[in-house]
């Protein structure tokens, strides 16, 4: 499954960066579009790509530079990472820290600790976590549907490691889907645990409806345009990975486009 998901992620990233409709949506600045009455793209707000800081990110950038032209922070040159940290205090959070803080938020919401995983600190200083085996339990007065729709915001989100944890933001090392700890990852787990898995039309529609609600419930903000794009793309890829794990294939293009529309509105 890991190899399949790796292949799927590469396929979705290719679509996100080459398909006109999907890419144009991921680049759309919804705020400026609404204020000005005409379509506007998110701005670079950084000089590292040889573009004017206030210039919009255009589709042609990927056509001219290639689909790998925008890469995660961890894959950027060390000097560039240092410059971004000095200029805008950009510091990304390791996944184990995101997990511990998300665990605290869930403990407050659910009223119980370690609902999704238990954290482990090895003698060598490496931090790990073990996913819980039993389904997540909900307190009286709250249901799994409430959890899926509960709103969460990551401010100065960078590549949104608190929302989705496809990879560790500090190392770019991929994280198996079973060990992901982002807010949206947790919502997808809850959906899988509480909806039927038999691949009927009705069951797929139910899962999709709840999954879209989950995507609609997470918000993020960042100053730099490449971070905004990477965050949007990561949520889109995560959705497709969970869809494929559940139903054995990637979602069709209209569904991918629908998710892109939602993601462009919440980040």
Predicted segment positions?
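Preference for the N-terminal adenyl/adenosyl cofactor-binding alpha/beta module
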Residues: 1-167, 226
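Conserved S-adenosyl-L-methionine
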Residues: 109-267
């Amino acid at each position: 499954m890991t190899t399949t998901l790796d292949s799927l992620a590469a396929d979705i990233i290719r679509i996100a960066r080459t398909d006109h409709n999907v890419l144009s949506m991921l680049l759309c600045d919804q705020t400026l579009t609404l204020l000005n009455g005409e379509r506007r793209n998110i701005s670079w707000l950084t000089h590292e790509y040889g573009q004017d800081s206030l210039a919009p990110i255009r589709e042609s950038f990927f056509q001219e530079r290639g689909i790998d032209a925008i890469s995660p922070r961890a894959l950027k040159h060390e000097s560039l990472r240092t410059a971004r940290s000095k200029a805008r205090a950009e510091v990304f959070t390791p996944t184990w820290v995101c997990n511990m803080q998300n665990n605290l938020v869930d403990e407050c919401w659910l009223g119980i600790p370690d609902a999704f995983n238990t954290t482990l600190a090895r003698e060598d200083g490496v931090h790990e976590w073990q996913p819980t085996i039993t389904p997540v339990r909900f307190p009286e007065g709250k249901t799994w549907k409430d959890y899926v729709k509960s709103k969460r915001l990551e401010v100065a989100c960078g590549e949104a490691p608190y929302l989705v944890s496809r990879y560790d933001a500090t190392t770019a090392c991929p994280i198996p889907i079973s060990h992901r700890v982002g807010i949206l990852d947790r919502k997808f787990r809850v959906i899988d645990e509480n909806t039927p898995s038999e691949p009927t039309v009705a069951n797929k529609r139910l899962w999709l409806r709840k999954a879209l609600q989950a995507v609609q419930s997470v918000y993020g903000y960042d100053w730099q345009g490449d971070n905004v794009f990477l965050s949007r793309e990561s949520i889109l890829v995560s959705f497709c990975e969970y869809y494929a794990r559940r139903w054995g294939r990637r979602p069709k293009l209209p569904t991918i486009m629908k998710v892109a529309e939602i993601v462009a509105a919440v980040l």
